């Protein structure tokens, strides 16, 4: 378990700033990202590199400063999954990753301006994704 403080919360849940990142039993790729302030708020997240191996973002200077990033090795990225009726209908928001500094456990959700990534990227794909 890892406790994480989000500087601005998550889009739609801006008032909730404290979260726990938890392993899911018998699951290597997916994680739980649960609010510690509101019991009924939680998300399933995945590393974007499990979905798109070449996933790449550029952090702006403001984000680097707010999260106190000193090195690219400080960063962990997570993306929120929207669970569908089936796994085939489930999607990953690749456009709004949660950026976490693993040195100080502070994070932010950012919205990428890059049109390359979608908020509805399929969780299951034939190109090496989950």
Curated annotation (Swiss-Prot):
HAMAP family: FliW. It comes from the Bacteria. The keyword Cytoplasm applies. GO terms for cellular component: cytoplasm. Acts as an anti-CsrA protein, binds CsrA and prevents it from repressing translation of its target genes, one of which is flagellin. Binds to flagellin and participates in the assembly of the flagellum. GO terms for biological process: bacterial-type flagellum assembly; regulation of translation. Keywords: Bacterial flagellum biogenesis, Chaperone, Cytoplasm, Translation regulation. It is found in: Cytoplasm. Its main location: cytoplasm. Disulfide bonds: none annotated. InterPro entries: Flagellar_assembly_factor_FliW (IPR003775), Flagellar_assmbl_FliW_dom_sf (IPR024046). This is Flagellar assembly factor FliW. Belongs to the FliW family. PANTHER family: FLAGELLAR ASSEMBLY FACTOR FLIW (PTHR39190:SF1). Interacts with translational regulator CsrA and flagellin(s).
